[in-house]
UniProtKB/Swiss-Prot annotation:
Residue intervals passing through the bilayer: none
InterPro entries: ATPase_NBD (IPR043129), Type_III_PanK (IPR004619)
Protein name: Type III pantothenate kinase
Binding residue positions for ATP: D9, A10, G11, N12, S13, R14, I15, K16, T129
Protein family membership: Belongs to the type III pantothenate kinase family.
Gene that specifies this protein: coaX
Organism expressing this protein natively: Burkholderia orbicola (strain MC0-3)
Length: 266
């Protein structure tokens, strides 16, 4: 039996990981928080030694150092590759003027989406600290994207930079809006703030989707991923598909596509 690939998606909010088998199926998955947020280390004691680790890290050098320490503690000398965006990989062509400027998480997500929905035009909306939108043609050409503050960041900015507005988390906002989204306008400040920022997310996505359909003169599947996808989905008025493993699935494809790392660092 071939060794699995360890896949790590280090985002700004949390770190997800998975083991992928020879068929690129995610056979074991988990997540853990950042040290700054009190996140405990993952329990990898039950995992077999992987062939190597393929990492997408958009969370900075401190997180990279923590991941190195975790990997060395569990599997000393384990080969690892920190992925970066390329001009072309796994059937996807990078349309950025400077391809390497595209975030590695977005690149892996594009590769995962192209494989998950072959032959379809896609608009991929991913909800994290930032909300990102990617336009991906059926032939694998990434033609560009948009980046906006995420739902939580929008609400936190209002709470931090105003004197009278509360600072709300997505958990609080989601609870406030439970059963209230049928009403187009809210009648207290916390719900008004929660709904206003949520509708800003939905409005951005629907506008981008309609513009893309008009520009391409073809059907476009809207794909949602990320932590706030359920809440934003309830505010949308257009058809959409949920997929929460695009980045890890893309990393599995990248791991298969690339040769085994030759050294412990890349």
């Amino acid at each position: 039996m071939s060794e699995p690939h360890l896949l790590i998606d280090a985002g700004n909010s949390r770190i997800k990981w998975a083991l992928a088998d020879a068929r690129r199926s995610l056979v074991d998955t988990g997540a853990f928080g950042h040290t700054r947020d009190g996140g405990a280390d993952p329990d990898w004691s039950h995992l077999p030694r992987p062939r190597g680790a393929w990492i997408s890290n958009v969370a900075g050098a401190d997180v990279a150092a923590r991941l190195d320490a975790l990997l060395d503690a569990r599997w000393p000398g384990l080969p690892r590759t920190t992925i970066r965006s390329r001009p072309v990989q796994c059937g996807v062509t990078n349309g950025y003027t400077t391809p390497e400027q595209l975030g590695s998480d977005r690149w892996a997500g594009l590769i995962g989406a192209h494989a998950a929905f072959p032959g379809e035009h896609l608009l991929i909306a991913t909800f994290g600290t930032a909300t990102t939108l990617e336009a991906l043609r059926a032939d694998g050409r990434f033609t560009g994207g948009l980046i906006a503050p995420g739902w939580a960041l929008m609400m936190r900015a209002l709470g931090t930079h105003t004197a009278q507005l509360p600072t709300l988390t997505t958990d609080i906002a989601s609870g406030l809006l439970a059963g209230a989204q049928a009403e187009p306008f809210q009648i207290d400040t916390p719900r008004s703030l929660s709904a206003g920022c949520l509708y800003a997310q939905a409005g951005l996505i629907e506008r981008a989707w309609r513009d893309l359909v008009a520009a391409w003169q073809a059907p476009v599947r809207l794909v949602l991923a990320g932590g706030a996808a359920d809440d934003v989905a309830r505010a949308l008025t257009v058809a959409h598909t949920r997929h929460d493993a695009l980045i890890l699935s893309g990393l599995a494809l990248i791991a298969t596509d690339t040769a085994a790392p030759a050294t412990a660092q890349d």
